[in-house]
Amino acid sequence: MTEAAELPPAPEQAREVFGDRFADAVRYAELLAEAGVQRGLIGPREVPRLWERHLLNCAVLSEVVPEGVTVCDVGSGAGLPGIPLALVREDLKITLLEPLLRRTNFLTEVVELLGLDHVTVIRGRAEEVMGKIPPVHVVTARAVAPLDRLATWGIPLLRPYGEMLALKGDTAEEELKSAATALSKLGAVETSVLHVGEGVVDPLSTVVRVEVGESPGGVRFAAKRAKAARTGRTRRRR
């Protein structure tokens, strides 16, 4: 049996980033280190670096999220980046989208315990909920899938002229080049690689931004979205 790793104290940067929600950030870190490890949501080797590699790495995504928008965190897992983002940005309306029950149970417990009234947890896959939940301004994701595959799930959930923000690693530029054709077919009009978290995390967090035009997901997904919307209206009339 592997001995449980100990959660280190929060770094000073965490107090600055999370502000009034610092105590909640500490509680979330404790939940990840305890229940998260016990339920297999996060590896025990990640516990010593929870703050730098996970909570702060995700929280600094807020630097590139517009004010007062709706956000869907696709494949939210244990709540990364959705929960840290929610802790630092109460102006956002955030949906945590996750297909696995054990993960959505954990997310629901965290949301209720921390009093995150601006966060909703939905169990499901992105391709299943398209047309069933309102399109959002921003889709976020971290460690879900290669960019081309992630885009086929995330971009169709966007409103016209929305954007997908994917936390990536050193291969961000390569992934973006490899996914160029797929992104274009999905309605992307602008892409970029951003580095955020100056003075908070080292190395900086890398974000791939994909901005879409009038038809997120392209023609094929526009038709699918319209069909899902019509089906929803029919069911409501019944």
UniProtKB/Swiss-Prot annotation:
GO terms for cellular component: cytosol. S-adenosyl-L-methionine binds at residues 75, 80, 126-127, 142. Gene3D superfamilies: Vaccinia Virus protein VP39. It is found in: Cytoplasm. InterPro entries: rRNA_ssu_MeTfrase_G, SAM-dependent_MTases_sf. Signal peptide: none annotated. Keywords: Cytoplasm, Methyltransferase, rRNA processing, S-adenosyl-L-methionine, Transferase. Its EC number is 2.1.1.-. One of its GO terms (molecular function) is rRNA (guanine-N7-)-methyltransferase activity. Pfam families: GidB (PF02527). The keyword Cytoplasm applies. Specifically methylates the N7 position of guanine in position 518 of 16S rRNA. Belongs to the methyltransferase superfamily. RNA methyltransferase RsmG family. This is Ribosomal RNA small subunit methyltransferase G.
